[in-house]
Structures are given as C-alpha cells and as structure tokens.
Amino acid sequence: MRQKAVSLFLCYLLLFTCSGVEAGKKKCSESSDSGSGFWKALTFMAVGGGLAVAGLPALGFTGAGIAANSVAASLMSWSAILNGGGVPAGGLVATLQSLGAGGSSVVIGNIGALMGYATHKYLDSEEDEE
C-alpha cells in the first residue's frame, strides 16, 4: 500500500511540474519546432525511467544484497571507511540498497522519469538563455 501511495505521489509531482508555468518568461510562438517540446520531454522521461530501473541492478544493488566486486560494493566500502567502520542508516548506500532490494520497478521508474524531466527542463532553460 505504501509503495502505491509513493508512486501516486511521484506521478502527481511529475504532472505538477510538467504543467507548471514559468512566470516572467515569454515564449516565442514563432518557433519552427512547436509541439516538439512534449516529445523531447517524453524521450528524456522514458530514458531516465529505463536507466533507473536497469541501473540499480547493473551497479550491484540487487534483491539478494550488494553484489560482490561491483560499484555498489565499492561504494559500501568507501562509506564504511569514511564513517568509522559502518554504513550509516539512511545514507546513500543504504537508500540505494533499499530501493534495489525492495523498491518496486514502478517507483524507481517514476523517480527516473522525474529526473529525466528535470534534466530536460534544465537543458531547455539553457537553450532559452542563448
């Protein structure tokens, strides 16, 4: 039930940010590629969601634990060294392991899609400044 609530909340945030209006900026209606912004954003969201779902297991954060000789194992080692011998609860490594072990693909995909959309908006705002 909690995963469904988190997933719905992330979908709400994603839709809220997609429909936001930027105050103080004028958009040119004479743009030659009008309408392509949606498809460009959708592409970033699909790539971000796909990478997030496939990325955690590829880094070594699996359902069976942290895979040996992986990036996740190195992160865990560095985290333990920096924190005096133990990995802190609620830290980056613990959070990623929790998502890799028990997080549903839907939640991870939503987070990745949100990150993809944020990347799109950042790159789009840089193009507007030029």
UniProtKB/Swiss-Prot annotation:
Signal peptide: none annotated. This is Interferon alpha-inducible protein 6. It comes from Homo sapiens (Human). Glycosylated. InterPro entries: IFI6/IFI27-like (IPR009311), IFI6/IFI27-like_sf (IPR038213). GO terms for cellular component: endoplasmic reticulum membrane; mitochondrial inner membrane; mitochondrial membrane; mitochondrial outer membrane; mitochondrion; plasma membrane. Keywords: Antiviral defense, Apoptosis, Endoplasmic reticulum, Immunity, Innate immunity, Membrane, Mitochondrion, Mitochondrion inner membrane, Transmembrane, Transmembrane helix. It is found in: Endoplasmic reticulum membrane; Mitochondrion inner membrane. Induction: Up-regulated by type-I interferon. Up-regulated upon Dengue virus type 2/DENV2 infection (at protein level). The keyword DNA repair does not apply. It holds the Pfam family Ifi-6-16. PANTHER family: INTERFERON ALPHA-INDUCIBLE PROTEIN 27, INTERFERON ALPHA-INDUCIBLE PROTEIN 6. The chain crosses the membrane at residues 4-24, 41-61, 75-95, 99-119. The keyword Kinase does not apply. The gene is IFI6. The lineage of its organism: Eukaryota, Metazoa, Chordata, Craniata, Vertebrata. Interferon-stimulated protein that plays an important role in innate immune response against a wide variety of viruses. Inhibits flavivirus replication by preventing the formation of virus-induced endoplasmic reticulum membrane invaginations, which are double-membrane vesicles that flaviviruses use for their replication. Has an antiviral activity towards hepatitis C virus/HCV by inhibiting the EGFR signaling pathway, whose activation is required for entry of the virus into cells. One of its GO terms (biological process) is regulation of epidermal growth factor receptor signaling pathway. Its main location: endoplasmic reticulum. GO terms for molecular function: molecular adaptor activity. Belongs to the IFI6/IFI27 family. It is a multi-pass membrane protein. Interacts with CIB1; the interaction is direct. Interacts with the chaperone BIP/HSPA5. Interacts with RIGI.
